[in-house]
Regions:
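Positively charged n-region of N-terminal signal peptides that target proteins for export
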Residues: 1-4
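Bacterial N-terminal signal peptides
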Residues: 6-17
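Rhodanese-like catalytic fold shared by cysteine-dependent sulfurtransferases
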Residues: 17-53, 58-61, 77-132, 137-187
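Short hydrophobic beta-strand that contains or immediately precedes a catalytic carboxylate
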Residues: 55, 65-70
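Surface-exposed acidic loop/strand-edge motifs in secreted or periplasmic proteins
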Residues: 69-73, 78
Length: 187
């Protein structure tokens, strides 16, 4: 091998290593099923990937529906009557619909139904409605949920990978959130 070719190979390898060090992640074929809080890809095939400025423009124009998929620990069933249970507070992008637990890689039938029904309500049944899916930064939950939304046939899906972390860093408003009720919620 000539010195020139060897030099080019070394230079190419030097460029690849920093990309990995910066957290560059390959978009998987399926859904992510572990390490949900870790670096995410820069892409999602079929979806628009939004910056904070782009998400803000959509929010201010009210041209899309924002869907938060951050998980939430459920209240354990069968707690003694006097047990105090406090849900962890969630602040999300004002006007969002919160569909917790819908970003896992594998969804139980009831959770998948909850997501489908939530998307149908959010979109008004319009499969072309702009749906902006988010969670936190470096959160695969939003990536999975956006990918699943595309698989359900929605055609205008945007993924906001910075989520409420990026939103708050930009000093944009947040609001106290409550999840959309599930059919099996205690009354």
């Amino acid at each position: 091998m000539s010195w020139r070719v060897a030099g080019l190979v070394i230079a190419a390898l030097a460029l690849v290593k920093p990309a990995r060090a910066q957290g560059w992640v390959v978009e998987p074929d399926g859904y992510r099923t572990e390490d949900y809080r870790s670096p995410v890809p820069e892409t999602l095939a079929g979806a628009r990937v939004l910056t904070t400025a782009e998400a803000e423009a959509i929010w201010r124009a009210k041209s899309g529906v924002f869907i938060d998929v951050l998980p939430r620990a459920p209240k354990p069933k069968g707690l003694p009557p006097n047990t105090v249970w406090r849900d962890k507070p969630r602040q999300d992008i004002p006007g969002s619909i919160w569909l917790p637990d819908t970003g896992y890689g594998i969804l139980a039938g009831a959770t998948e139904s909850y997501l489908r029904q939530g998307l149908a309500r959010a979109s008004g049944g319009n499969m072309q409605a702009l749906l902006v899916i988010y969670c936190l930064s470096d959160c695969w939950m939003s990536w999975n949920a956006a990918k699943r939304t595309l698989a359900y046939g929605y055609s205008d899906v945007a993924w906001y990978p910075e989520g409420t972390d990026g939103w708050a860093r930009a000093n944009l408003p947040v609001a106290d959130a409550q999840p959309e009720p599930r059919p099996d919620d205690e009354k």
